[in-house]
Structure formats: C-alpha cells, structure tokens
Amino acid sequence: MKDKIKTKILSPFLYFLKSESSSGIILLICAIAAIMIANSSFSGGYEHIFHTNITIGYGVFSLSMSVLHWINDGLMAIFFLVVGMEIKREVVFGELKSFKRTILPISAAIGGMIVPAIIYALFNYKEPTITGWGIPMATDIAFALGMLSLVAKNAPKGIVVFLTALAIVDDLGAIIVIAIFYNSQISWIALLLGLIVFATLILANKFKIKYTSIYIILGIILWICLLKSGIHATIAGVLLGMSLPIGENIHKFKTSILYKLEHILTPWSSFVIMPIFAFANAGIIINTDNFSGSLFSPASLGIIFGLFVGKQIGIFGTSFILIKLKIAKFPSNVTKRHLYGASVFGGIGFTMSIFVSSLSFADANILSEAKMCIMIASILAATYGTIVFKFINFKNEKLNYKQS
C-alpha cells in the first residue's frame, strides 16, 4: 500500500523531470538554429515572421500582437501554467511539503537569486542598464536538468531532487520579480477585474467545481485582464495553476483537474512551447566588429559574472552555511561536490534569462548584447558543470576500484 502511494506521489514528478531534461537537447538545437538563421541570408525572413501582426477576435473583442508577442505573452502563459501546477503539487504532496526537506533548496534558490542580482547591480550602478538586474537571477530548468541527466547519469537521486526543487523555487522567484518590477503602466480597472476573476477561480475550487472547461475559460479571461492591466500576462498561467483543484488527499490526486491538465500540457510545454520560444528569441545577430567591446559593457559583465559566478556563490555558499550551522543537512547520498556541481548548472539561465531580458531592455542593440551574454554565460556554466561532474565520476570510479 505504501509503495502504491509513493508511486502516485513520485510518478508525476518523474514524468515532469523526464520531459524537462530531455527537452533541453531540443532547446539547444532550436537556439543554435535561430542563431545560424539570424546570421545568414535568411535573417530578413526570420525577422519578418516574428514581427508580423496577428489579430484574434473581431472589433472591440479582438487582440492584435506580433507573432513574437503572442509567443512571449501567450504560449509562455501555458509554460507558466505548468510551472504553477508543478509548484502546487510539490507544496501539497511532494518535495516542498516538509519544511525540513525544503529549507535547503529554498534557501539555496533565494541565495542563487540575490547574489547574481547584487553582482549585476554592482557592474551597472548608475547605468541605464540597471533595469536588467533580474536577468542573472533566472535558471533554465530544462537545460539544467538536461545537463545533469546527460553528464551525471549515476548521480544520487537526492541531487536531482535538490536541483529540481531549487529550479522550481527559482521559477517562482522569477515570476514574483516579473510581476512586481517588470511591468508597464498599470491599468487598475483591468487589474481589479483580473483579481475578481482570480477570486472566482479560488471559489470554484473551494466549492469543488470539477468542470475543467470552467477553469480554462476563467483562465483565458484572467490572461486578457492581466494583458490589458500592464501586469505581465504570463502571471495568469501561474495563478490558474495554483488555483486548480488537486484533490483532498493523495488517493484522489490522480482524478483531479490539476493532474489531468499537467499530464496533458507538460509534454506540449517541454517539446513545443519552449523550443518555439527558444527559436523565436535566441536569434542573435553576432557583430564581430563590435564583439569584444560589447563583451566588456556593464550589462554584459553583470550578466556573465552574475550567472556564472553569482549562481555558484549564491547556491553553494548558502547551502554550505546552512549545513555547517546544522539548520539543514545533505540530501541522501549527496556530497558537497554534488552540491557544487548543481550550483554551477544553476548558472544556465538561457530561456528564462532571455525572457527577463526581453522585459528589461527596449533598445534592440542592448537586448541583442544581453542575449549573447546569456548564451555565453550559460555555455560556460554547462561546460564547467560537466567538468565538475566528470571529476566526481572519476573520483567515484577510482574509489570503487580501490575497494574492489
């Protein structure tokens, strides 16, 4: 009986993990393809496609945005819906339920957000690019887990759970930062209507309404309200995910709306939405004439050092201090080397950092420069993280050989 309950708890987590990690390879392919096309004779067509306006609806009941905005505001809301459902499930039934089990990844995630932001701010103090302080705070869960699964196949499950929980908390932190700091002028009427819709979602859950269509319709209305309010529309996805019925206990979880939607949307989010987002946003035009100069601008240095150095200091430093003070303890079979390797992979910002950069900078040149540095920092983190885990594998193999 206990094994069945354990399987029910872990199966969605493992399903999510498998989808996120394997989609990292597809994300990488899409990003490389976007860069190659943006720097080829097809660049004009690439730009034209994503800046073409598409109108949905009719008259006053219509929305008109570029393809890029439909991707960043529309499709990404579905990605954040999956994140919202994942957060709720982990808080209610999973790895974020117990305070003792969550203090380490939560604190590490907070440290991994604060330190990179401070490093960026130090480089950009009194500069107009200070608005990009949120860029190095983000971790790309798909790439981070993808790299871990590729280079550390024999890593203890504890470090996988740690990095996953850390990335989830990191996503939640990014959502809060976007909601509070990266918004245009607020329309209070639209925001009030959005809050009323969200309250309706909460009441629907409380009164145990089990019609999925009602939640989806209310979620779309909430998305429109937030889009019109100036609050970034992707927040609607998180709010919808957090308000979906999850079941009173683990036995009823698999019949809940949240479980069903999560299993339907997770593969679409991992293998369709995120690759499209990567392809649409990673098309950086590399100007070799000004390449070295742009690398040493305050924004570039802030992003590279924030992601590559700041994440390591923030995640590993916070974890090490908490463990030394005996406030937290190592996950099962996890060593400080594993924690350090995971903290390095935390510096893979990629899609999430690119997303925040698109909200931070209106200037196309600065935005292109920021995206390029995000790619550089993410590649550095992925490469160095691989070296760290290869070293751990070598040490373990050497130890096993001596023992045999």
From Swiss-Prot:
Reaction equations catalysed: Na(+)(in) + 2 H(+)(out) = Na(+)(out) + 2 H(+)(in)
One Gene Ontology CC term in the entry: plasma membrane
Keywords assigned: Antiport, Cell membrane, Ion transport, Membrane, Sodium, Sodium transport, Transmembrane, Transmembrane helix, Transport
Signal peptide: none
Membrane association type: Multi-pass membrane protein
InterPro entries on file: Na/H_antiporter_dom_sf, NhaA
Spans traversing the lipid bilayer: 24-44, 67-87, 103-123, 132-152, 161-181, 184-204, 216-236, 266-286, 303-323, 339-359, 372-392
Main location: membrane
GO MF annotations, alphabetized: sodium:proton antiporter activity
Role: Na(+)/H(+) antiporter that extrudes sodium in exchange for external protons.
Name of the molecule in the record: Na(+)/H(+) antiporter NhaA 2
